[in-house]
Amino acid sequence: MLSLGDTHAAQGDGEICGTAIESPMDVAIKVDLVKDAQFPFPRFETQGPVTRHFDSNGYWATTGIGEDLFQAARDAVSGMVDQVAKETGMSALEAYMLCSVCGDLRISEIVDMPNWTVSFYFPKIVLG
């Protein structure tokens, strides 16, 4: 099975508010057929780096920690939305949408179960 679609000019890892910068694209892909392969879940390979182009000005990062992974993610996102709004003068909604298109939501730690740690990284370069 092969699936391709929903191209974006930019989207943060997590697409936290369901928005990205939608755009039409022409796409060229290379497909290797692996006959009789049985994969238990989707997989892909990328040349990377995935986000290094944002690294030059550093990041703001917020963290959520708790027994519920989803709540920890919400706490990390909420903290970043508040920080971006405060630092830039944007409304909370504007900051939320900006976080969705350029920030990255990452699971930072799962070994200390039931305390999940989730971090949200906002690349400061997008603010100029």
Features from the language model and the residues they span:
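Glycine-rich anion/phosphate-binding loop at the beta-strand->alpha-helix junction
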Residues: 1-44, 78, 87, 92-93, ...
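A hydrophobic, small-residue-rich beta->alpha segment in the mid-to-C-terminal subdomain
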Residues: 46-98
